[in-house]
UniProtKB/Swiss-Prot annotation:
Mg(2+) binds at residues 488, 494. It comes from Exiguobacterium sibiricum (strain DSM 17290 / CCUG 55495 / CIP 109462 / JCM 13490 / 255-15). The keyword Oxidoreductase does not apply. Belongs to the polyribonucleotide nucleotidyltransferase family. This is Polyribonucleotide nucleotidyltransferase. GO terms for cellular component: cytosol. Disulfide bonds: none annotated. The gene is pnp. Residues 698-739 are annotated as: Disordered. It is found in: Cytoplasm.
Amino acid sequence: MSQTKQTFSTELGGRPLTIEIGQLAKQANGAALIRYGETAVLATVVASKQPKDLDFFPLTVNYEEKLYAAGKIPGGFLKREGRPGENAILTSRLIDRPIRPLFPDGFRHDIQVATTVLSSDEDNSPEVAAMIGASIALSISDIPFDGPIAGVTIGRVNGEFIINPTMSQASESDIDLQVAGTKHAVNMVEAGAKEVSEQAMLEAILLGHDVIKELIAFQEEIVAAVGQEKFAYTVASFDETLVNRLKAEALAEVTTAVQVEEKQARDLAINEVISKYIDQYAADDSITEAQLAEVSGVLNKFVKTEVRRLITEDKVRPDGRGLAEIRPLDSEIGLLPRAHGSGLFTRGQTQVLSVATLGVAGDAQIIDGLGLKAEKRFMHHYNFPPFSVGEARPMRAPGRREIGHGALGERALLPVLPSETDFPYTIRLVSEVLESNGSSSQASICGSILAMMDAGVPLKAPVAGIAMGLIKEGENYSILTDIQGMEDHLGDMDFKVAGTKDGVTALQMDMKIGGITRQILEEALEQARLGRLHILEHMNSVIAEPRVELSKYAPKIVTLKINPDKIRDVIGPGGKVINGIIDETGVKIDIDQDGTVFIASTDQDGINHARQLIEDIVREVVIGEEFDGTVRRVEKFGAFVELFKGKDALVHISELALERVGQTEDVVKLGDKLKVRVTEVDDKGRVNASHKVLLVEGMSPEDRAAYDEKKKTERDSRPPRRDTGSRPPRDGQRPPRRN
């Protein structure tokens, strides 16, 4: 790589995109600094010197968000970045998926792609910059790579498509589409949408590819200027003599084995063929040790070629289904009595138990990344234990795959959730994969819908998901509906589509080949739509509408609106007031900055009591209002009467009785009930009230006339005030102040 900084510029979505090469990370095989607006991402790639002895391609992609990029200091005791967050993991996957198919078959050098966000504004996507940066770093390096690739985000506001929408535009968009590909074809799609038609999604994908082609032409100029020659590499290959012998002796048995319909029986049949020929060739003196080590690999290659041949030529799938046929469906709800909602969805040998839990606003997840701090009130977590595929492996924390599948389900379900105003609950869904033979992520979407409907969540519409596959040999191809594990593993495409009967809510496409054409995309989307409608019909037969009542174990939530200026009164100094209410009533209370108060509990009486306490605290006292109060304090000058919890009024001694009162205790004592009327509220909120005015109004006309006459006589009999005249002038100067 050149050691002198070189700069290349273009525009993306009407904003400047600048690539700087040759200044940073010069010991990496390839490095580039991408500036997009005020967003800056460093992309580096490194390859091991020697290939690894592995049967897979060891590619690692990392996307790192440094909080200094947004002018933030990490929280916690250590004050440094910890494990990558969910967004970083999902972005790593977004970069990995389009570049992985473009490395040579059999390439076994360790490859590490690292993209680091160094600066981030709120409008220019660091994810897009990182994907472009990874492609440029690979393309200019000496690492064999059949790129470049590029990626863009497509949104749609008021029917108009937008390239790389800003944050404000994204909030109004009904499509959130990330698309990546080469100059020839699209090879990665990730999308969320608000029940958008298949045709609109196709148009968005194709628009994205048009932009991608422009970005790739820009990258090719960079490669021509600073690109390195690719290093030579060796690809492991099987012994040709062994391949030919096994083809003659074992291919027919492999063909029979791959057509066993049941998954475990099919796996057993394939393993028996492999074991048979390993044992047979181990006893054959003409077979070398090196050839014997390759027997399993050759036979597994035959498994792949035969499955693909049967599908593309004979239109026969391993389990005997037609290309567009969906496996048998079975569903059940309400399996777990103490859970708020549960749904079991089974499709063939894939089975998912989804469980819905309803929580309060305080249960929302706090998201504090490079962007603005936000709360997430809907979560979908996906778990894939080893027993689901009949394996004994360590039970570990969720990996990238589980996090990715959980996020896909979340994206698919989000558009049909009720608004927070209509349903002020935090919703957590957990999908437990109990059996897996492909399409478990889509089964988790179906199971989650069943669980939420069982929980009484008022969904706008049910959603179903289906996974499509592709087997392509030259110009000959077959699109598969509801792929099973073997078809996913040996096929060329995994295309997941989720949506309602009216439109798509999520898409995810991964390719193992260079890309696919518009025709294949169109056919796959239409085939997926028909499959989705079939699954929705089945789900509707199990539960057609969400339950009217929530589970008795779910919290009930009541909301009320208070003046935001009164929030501090409800909270109190150090939280004293609100904690007192919580302790007294046993409820949970959350308050938004706009004055919305959420009160939650399984006990309705506790909710009602807490609501009354809060309403009393924020209540505005009006002159003329009457209260049946309680005497809480007695002073020489009058009594303090509690009108309601948290609000007292002073009843002056002259306002306690009709006659003159010598001592306050002569009329009232602590704890006495006293009816009063508010006569004054000062600018500090202090209240004066009168009991006497109510006594006067309660008199009969005769008594009132006599009382008024008596008061008049008393006033007339008082001696006149002494007239002291005006104050005389001061003589001389005022004495100085005392120190």
